[in-house]
Swiss-Prot record:
Changing residue 277 to R: In K-less, no effect on ubiquitination. Residues 115-206 are annotated as: Alpha-2. PROSITE patterns: IG_LIKE, IG_MHC. Residues 25-309 are extracellular. The gene is H2-D1. Pfam families: C1-set, MHC_I, MHC_I_C. This is H-2 class I histocompatibility antigen, D-B alpha chain. Residues 1-24 form the signal peptide.
Length: 362
């Protein structure tokens, strides 16, 4: 099972990627599945994508030349042919289920079959620090909007509208919740254990964040301080701004944790402060890759005058060091020659240069 993602999948992605991980737990597995009907074509396009700890590890696309489940993470290549054949057959079964479901939904909503319609499913499970089931998920969306979802008790359903009530009644009569509950509590957990074991070098690693604060002028005597955390893994991280030691939860702008594209994540949090009061504000960074939380302030660059003074001092010190070295060398030569000038032989090929210099009189 799995998913793709045109813009309509953002609804499910936001819900599914919200839980983050620590190495002891929790860990997560998600499958996103999307079927899109196409005018003039009997079969919808079906795409399934699997994620472990927010990392893609398998994919199926019915429009591929040879539709099969394929590995999307190096550690999945250790699975044998029987695994891929079994998962491919499951995906093809799901493809047919989605085709029938799309047709039913057209009737529920009194829609024409001539347009393009989208049905999506997100399913998966989270493990706690004891590696037991923390929560199971099963959610459906139609045309990019919530349709029906299995509640956290894994026994009851929440239907989003009148059409979804039809599906809810059918599934209650057939005992669908019991079927999904058994999968989420059993097979989902067992496979997640297996994937975490196979991919432990990648999935169970810890990369500590690299953090810094940037300064952005605003109008009316204000500036924005932005605290950045880059290159961290896993995705679970906390950034907070403090004013004189007190947290500014209400006045802080915080973006969602984002993939960096290299297997790590990035995040920032900003706060607007009065110009000249920047040093009263500190950013705190909490991540399991850090031995202790980081505390950062904005570090103003040195002024031009200070910079010139530093350069001048360094220049004087450098010149003094060179002069000292020359004097020491000359004194040593004089001691070695009894106080007389040393014999300096010209380097080969330097005769003409020496003659021309000697003939240049004032």
């Amino acid at each position: 099972m799995g998913a793709m993602a045109p813009r309509t999948l953002l609804l499910l992605l936001a819900a599914a990627l919200a839980p983050t991980q620590t190495r002891a737990g929790p860990h997560s597995m998600r499958y996103f599945e999307t079927a899109v009907s196409r005018p003039g074509l009997e079969e919808p396009r079906y795409i399934s994508v699997g994620y472990v700890d927010n990392k893609e590890f398998v994919r199926f696309d019915s429009d591929a030349e040879n539709p099969r489940y394929e590995p999307r993470a190096p550690w999945m290549e250790q699975e044998g042919p029987e695994y891929w054949e079994r998962e491919t057959q499951k995906a093809k079964g799901q493809e047919q289920w989605f085709r029938v479901s799309l047709r039913n939904l057209l009737g529920y909503y009194n829609q024409s079959a001539g347009g393009s319609h989208t049905l999506q499913q997100m399913s998966g499970c989270d493990l706690g620090s004891d590696w037991r089931l923390l929560r199971g998920y099963l959610q459906f969306a139609y045309e990019g909007r919530d349709y029906i979802a299995l509640n956290e008790d894994l026994k009851t359903w929440t239907a989003a509208d009148m059409a979804a009530q039809i599906t809810r009644r059918k599934w209650e009569q057939s005992g669908a919740a019991e079927h999904y509950k058994a999968y989420l509590e059993g097979e989902c957990v067992e496979w997640l254990h297996r994937y975490l074991k196979n991919g432990n070098a990648t999935l169970l690693r810890t990369d500590s964040p690299k953090a810094h604060v940037t300064h952005h002028p605003r109008s009316k005597g204000e500036v924005t301080l932005r605290c950045w955390a880059l290159g961290f893994y896993p995705a679970d991280i906390t950034l907070t701004w403090q004013l004189n030691g007190e947290e500014l939860t209400q006045d802080m702008e915080l973006v969602e944790t984002r993939p960096a594209g290299d297997g790590t994540f990035q995040k920032w949090a900003s706060v607007v402060v009065p110009l000249g009061k920047e040093q009263n504000y500190t950013c705190r960074v909490y991540h399991e890759g850090l031995p202790e939380p980081l505390t950062l302030r904005w570090e103003p660059p040195p002024s031009t005058d200070s910079y010139m003074v530093i350069v001048a001092v360094l220049g004087v010190l450098g010149a003094m060091a060179i002069i000292g070295a020359v004097v020491a060398f000359v004194m040593k030569r004089r001691r070695n020659t009894g106080g007389k000038g040393g014999d300096y032989a010209l380097a080969p090929g330097s005769q003409s240069s020496e003659m021309s210099l000697r003939d240049c009189k004032a």
